[in-house]
């Protein structure tokens, strides 16, 4: 299994509340700055953030942009449905995540989310 496949599989399980694979692939000293919440997050924080946001998001297709022994960059598409929160229509975004490894474990990552003005599922098959 490639690093990208492992990363995607781990978080797809995590979106369903099973963080066992996430726990295995992340370094104990993992830290990340979460732009959505404005906090430096550790892995436990990321799990809470993911569980909370998953209630209003549908995660779609993932694509590997770059992968090496120490670095991974993946893109995914999301549908955000904030109707229950603020009454707005669903919207779509592309997320690019850069992942850094230390001794085979994820030590840091950053995600950039960019709004889209179209539904990417009309053009890209979901995986």
Regions found by a protein language model. Give the residues of each.
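Short glycine/proline-enriched coil/turn segments at helix->beta-strand junctions
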Residues: 2, 41, 56-58
């Amino acid at each position: 299994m490639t690093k990208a496949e492992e990363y995607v599989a781990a978080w797809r399980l995590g979106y369903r509340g099973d963080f066992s694979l996430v726990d295995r692939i992340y370094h104990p000293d993992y830290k990340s700055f979460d732009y959505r919440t404005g906090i430096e997050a550790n892995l436990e924080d990321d799990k809470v953030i993911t569980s909370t946001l998953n209630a209003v998001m549908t995660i779609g297709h993932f694509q590997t942009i770059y992968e090496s022994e120490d670095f991974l960059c993946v893109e995914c598409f999301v549908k955000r449905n904030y109707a229950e929160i603020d009454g707005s229509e669903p919207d779509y975004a592309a997320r690019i995540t850069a992942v850094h490894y230390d001794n085979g474990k994820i030590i840091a990552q950053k995600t950039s989310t960019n709004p889209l003005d179209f539904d990417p599922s009309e053009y890209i098959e979901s995986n």
